[in-house]
Amino acid sequence: MRKYIKIGVAGPVGAGKTALIERLTREIASKYSVAVITNDIYTQEDAEFLTKNSLLPPERIMGVETGGCPHTAIREDASMNLEAVDEMVARFPEVELIFIESGGDNLSATFSPDLADVTIFVIDVAQGEKIPRKGGPGITRSDLLVINKTDLAPFVGADLSVMERDARRMRNGQPFIFTNLMKNENLDGVIGWIEKYALLKNIEDPASLVR
């Protein structure tokens, strides 16, 4: 009986996907058995960053070089990633959480249901306050939307209240959360969401979660 949960993490280049996984693994690796699979088109840069900066040992981090369009490797033809999952489970039969990070993509990125049990989509304030209302499957269909880099709002003229209003409208009751991962702000809310909705712990919704 399979006992691990696969969490897909997608979003545009530079939004904070790798930073989110790095900080999550730092906080939860002592509590859960965790592994990470990253996707890059031609390099293993994200895997190398996590190996250098994460608390996870190198053998719990695997890089997949997709060699093409990043969303193909997580949706239309997820075979390379599914093989990586199988290899990781063979290495660590006790694994409980496997984070699968997509390559940087646009707002239409979605994971094959065979590859991810739940999905997190990361955008950032620096892209402008209009990003939530642009929609796209990443915004509207992900299980959790993370709006990162709230500290940059004053510098790019973004109104967080407008972003919250638009995210509420586009998400239609699905949760989202504002973060500043550089300072771990609301990281506990993301962890709480994972524990409640991915690991199915009997806990309250995190206070920082918005619907």
Swiss-Prot record:
One GO CC term on file: cytoplasm
Principal place of residence: cytoplasm
Highest taxon in the source lineage: Bacteria
Name of the coding gene: ureG
Key words of the record: Chaperone, Cytoplasm, GTP-binding, Nickel insertion, Nucleotide-binding
Entry's Gene Ontology molecular function annotations: GTP binding; GTPase activity; nickel cation binding
Listed InterPro entries: CobW/HypB/UreG_nucleotide-bd, P-loop_NTPase, UreG
Subcellular location(s) of the protein: Cytoplasm
Subunit structure: Homodimer. UreD, UreF and UreG form a complex that acts as a GTP-hydrolysis-dependent molecular chaperone, activating the urease apoprotein by helping to assemble the nickel containing metallocenter of UreC. The UreE protein probably delivers the nickel.
SUPFAM superfamilies: P-loop containing nucleoside triphosphate hydrolases (SSF52540)
Protein name: Urease accessory protein UreG
Family from the record: Belongs to the SIMIBI class G3E GTPase family. UreG subfamily.
Residues holding GTP: G11, P12, V13, G14, A15, G16, K17, T18
Function text: Facilitates the functional incorporation of the urease nickel metallocenter. This process requires GTP hydrolysis, probably effectuated by UreG.
Any Gene Ontology biological process: urea catabolic process
